[in-house]
Regions:
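A contiguous loop/helix-start segment that scaffolds small-molecule binding in enzyme catalytic cores
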Residues: 29-30, 109, 116-228
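Class I S-adenosyl-L-methionine
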Residues: 1-62, 70-71
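General beta-strand structural signal in soluble alpha/beta enzymes
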Residues: 35, 62-65, 112, 138
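Class I SAM-dependent methyltransferase SAM-binding "motif I" and its flanking Rossmann-like core
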Residues: 48-106
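Short hydrophobic/aromatic-enriched beta-strand-loop microsegments
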Residues: 4-10, 60-61, 81-87, 133-138, ...
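Short, acidic/turn-prone active-site loops that include or flank metal/cofactor-
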Residues: 7-15, 66, 87-92, 141-143
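Short, hinge-like loop/turn segments at secondary-structure boundaries
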Residues: 2-5, 50-51, 76-81, 129-130, ...
């Protein structure tokens, strides 16, 4: 009679279970870390387990499997020789704002994960920080029956998902900042310049248009900041 292999869930942040697994490894036994969604360890609690195993001099072997980040990157048509992986962006507003500013300056292709109920918000944030014309591809249901890849620009995909309710988990592949000569103006600098023009007597809509052309931020967004 075949011995049944014990299966346990590992969701991270469980020190008791983590130490029990390490004890198994240190007793010269093996375990397999598997996932029902993507490659274990990539935006996954498995990373915590692998880190602990390496710290305790346990051998770790990876059998390559599917990964949404690289799969979406390959089919995006965007440059893939150099790219950066962001996973899910921070939820805390201050950290999220800083991360978005960093992404807006990034010359490499960037890969981001997002849930369906937060996708529109992410696209709106990317439109503000990166500009609505930044190239983008959004993939869902990768390697499955209803696989879908949508994209060209942030503006176009935002319009698409406003008309078609987002479903499934999304992998966003964002083109890099092609402006190599000059970095995009920071949000605070753009708003400071806008306020200076207003104080100098420039009309609000004219000032917003000028700073939009100079900074890359949308005129509508800049104008809205004047009335908050």
């Amino acid at each position: 009679m075949n011995k049944i292999t014990k299966i346990e869930t590992f969701t991270g942040w469980n020190l008791r279970k983590l130490w029990r697994i390490l004890e198994i490894l240190e007793s010269n036994k093996s375990i397999a870390l598997i996932s029902d969604a993507g490659l274990p360890g990539i935006n996954d609690p498995g990373q915590e387990l692998v880190h602990a195993a390496k710290l305790n001099s346990c051998e770790v072997i990876c059998i390559p499997g599917p990964c949404a980040a690289t799969t979406a990157l390959v089919i995006s048509g965007l440059p893939s020789e150099r790219f950066c992986f962001e996973g899910f962006l921070p939820k805390k507003q201050s950290l999220r704002k800083k991360r978005l500013e960093d992404i807006s300056q990034e010359n490499r292709t960037t890969v981001i994960y997002e849930s369906p109920h937060q996708l529109i918000k992410l696209l709106e944030d990317l439109s503000i920080s990166c500009g609505k014309e930044r190239p983008i591809q959004i993939a869902r249901e990768l390697t499955k029956r209803y696989e879908e890849s949508i994209g060209k620009t942030i503006e176009q995909v935002t319009k698409y998902f406003l008309e078609n309710k987002p479903k499934g988990e999304f992998t966003i592949v964002l083109g890099g900042n092609s402006n190599k000569k000059k970095n995009r103006m920071s949000e605070s600098d753009a708003l400071n310049k806008l306020n200076i023009l207003i104080k100098q007597g420039e009309k609000s809509n004219v000032a917003a248009r000028k700073i939009a052309e100079e900074s890359g931020y949308e005129k509508k967004w800049l104008y809205s900041k004047l009335h908050k």
